[in-house]
């Protein structure tokens, strides 16, 4: 006999239904503990392949593996109860064919129990998105600046800022929506373009360096907490935890070296005889 939880987790259809409504709040998380904190205030949690930068110190997200994403996705699911958890599909796990994408996405859903996957690309990935959604896998799209394409782009630069550069990005947005994605991340595009895309398509847009007019926003948690040395322009720091963490580590090191720690209150005495 199983005991059913009374806690209801948000789903992809819940997020889809927020189009044009209250803004969708989303942050990244890679650990159970931070997920439990983010879960209290956010509608969705993204287990982003940015974990390659944040956790592993990679310069790009390209080296991230499917196994890394599954491991951290499972941790975030264990730490959260309410938010929709979306796990990134890493570079090399979905581009070769629709079938490869399905097998990778199915592994993510089966092994993490998350509610959706996210993949990068617009027109070029539309058939893949449709293939997944038709087989019961909720997909969040990602257009504009696509970090997994860094070796093609050459640098992490905002998109759609030049005259005549909007059309391909608009086409990507339409393709993702028409393919059945329940929402789409719009990253680092000119603000008027982010606004136009939001008005143009029928699914929620989740902005990151796009526009306040988007249906929601997402940031990397460590960026907004002040733990990243050089965050992108679009990041607002809501905390400055770096100096506080450094001060705590410094204080610990000093007390260990001076033998001030552990103190009497931190050690165990002998039990008295009855």
From Swiss-Prot:
GO terms for biological process: pantothenate biosynthetic process. Binds 1 Mg(2+) ion per subunit. Mg(2+) binds at residues 49, 88, 120. It is found in: Cytoplasm. One of its GO terms (molecular function) is 3-methyl-2-oxobutanoate hydroxymethyltransferase activity. Pathway: Cofactor biosynthesis; (R)-pantothenate biosynthesis; (R)-pantoate from 3-methyl-2-oxobutanoate: step 1/2. Homodecamer; pentamer of dimers. This is 3-methyl-2-oxobutanoate hydroxymethyltransferase. The lineage of its organism: Bacteria, Pseudomonadati, Pseudomonadota, Alphaproteobacteria, Hyphomicrobiales. The gene is panB.
């Amino acid at each position: 006999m199983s005991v059913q939880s009374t806690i209801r987790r948000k789903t992809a259809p819940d997020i889809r239904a927020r189009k044009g409504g209250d803004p969708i709040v989303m942050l990244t998380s890679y650990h159970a503990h931070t997920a439990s904190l983010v879960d209290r205030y956010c509608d969705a949690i993204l287990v982003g392949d940015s974990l390659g930068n944040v956790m592993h110190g990679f310069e790009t997200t390209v080296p991230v593996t499917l196994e890394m994403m599954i491991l951290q996705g499972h941790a975030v699911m264990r730490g959260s109860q309410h938010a929709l958890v979306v796990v990134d599909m890493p570079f090399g796990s979905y581009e070769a064919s629709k079938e490869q994408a399905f097998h990778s996405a199915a592994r993510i859903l089966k092994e993490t129990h998350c509610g959706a996957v996210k993949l990068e690309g617009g027109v070029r990935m539309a058939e893949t998105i449709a293939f997944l959604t038709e087989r019961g896998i909720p997909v969040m799209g990602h257009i504009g600046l696509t970090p997994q394409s860094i070796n093609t782009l050459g640098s992490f630069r905002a998109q759609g800022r030049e005259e005549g550069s909007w059309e391909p990005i608009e086409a990507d947005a339409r393709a993702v929506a028409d393919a059945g994605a329940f929402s789409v991340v719009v990253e680092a595009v000119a603000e008027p373009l982010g606004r136009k895309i939001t008005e143009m398509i029928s699914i929620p847009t989740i902005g990151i360096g796009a526009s306040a007019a988007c249906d929601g926003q997402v940031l990397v948690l460590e960026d907004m907490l002040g733990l990243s040395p050089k965050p992108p322009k679009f990041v607002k720091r809501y905390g400055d935890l770096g100096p506080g963490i450094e001060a705590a580590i410094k204080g610990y090191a000093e007390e260990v070296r001076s033998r001030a720690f552990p103190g009497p209150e931190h050690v165990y005495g002998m039990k008295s005889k009855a």
